[in-house]
């Protein structure tokens, strides 16, 4: 088990990303002193890989039905006793995800939901030549499709691989935390449909928000902290 922990923290597990347990004080520099500052939590041990979140996102945000276009997706990680790591994206199917066969060579298997990390210091915003990618005052990175020229600079700059070029509009697209919903005090579609409450959304500046409670009660990881993008998607139970 010590070897597994070392493997996870070393950065080889989650999509090549670097994982790090962060103390509570590390979050203080992200949020402005006033106003809302949105973030997201994922409880890995609660995710069952049902893909309801993915389906809800595609419907809510008119994401292309082709399997390689996602605003959010779920990956299955299988860590074997010999150190081999197998990563597969769970496909969206009406019948759900089939049960994994019993394999005594497997040390650990789990699901990891992925989405835009809504970085506090987003590289995608910095590289956009026309200002189409921007950050709202409440910390959500959006794309103005009317001004996006489809140059793909932001897609290349994103270290988390969460952006894609929409095949119809030919503009950059990605997760927005369902900004049209949260602006009306509704939850993101993926959070609303999750049957196990594995996804948590909230205001980082509110001590009473579900996300604040999630961070207080769990050891938190973020993806690729060494890049200093200050991601605002926090993972527990990795």
Regions found by a protein language model. Give the residues of each.
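Non-ligating segments of multi-cofactor redox enzymes
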Residues: 1-238
